[in-house]
């Protein structure tokens, strides 16, 4: 997913929030479409008291996604996982505070190894071209993204009871609520005007942005549901361990999905 997202952001670096909004709307549309095909997918009723209870998890989700998108836009795709490398250690810390429990020493050792790898990855490298070196702001974006993703993973477990323990209902609330929050930010960032100007330009190929939004929106939706199921069945920390393993395998594979 990261190389595909990066390809779209390279084609439209001035439209990060609009791109994110497109993905969220596609997820909501897919949920509505799936609900017509099978009774197992139920769209929740939009009730104010439920919205208030889910406001923290929805807000943390969209803030994390925004920082995540900004980080990916500003760094090379190969460096993105390093910039976000603190997800696992921060999830362990946040989960520890939230549950008032201490993970095993092996978990802390794993967190220490990952932290050391992160610090090594962001340290200056004289062999790296200046143009390829990540900026300080992009590293900060990555750290903030990691922090909010960690908090979000912990909040998911606590939010499921408000959605009848349904990952589908939580996915719907999360994507719809996030889209509502990011919509005014698109206007404030002037991205509608930017999109109109670029669409009128003969030099800009809008196909990468449009088709990329559709493809990554579909796969992003599937990953969202899979992640919620993983946290529901296991725990935030276990979910992050499995996610890191998958990302490592994906990093070693060629970028053939771009």
Region spans (language model):
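Polytopic endomembrane small-metabolite transporters, centered on the Drug/Metabolite Transporter
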Residues: 1-258
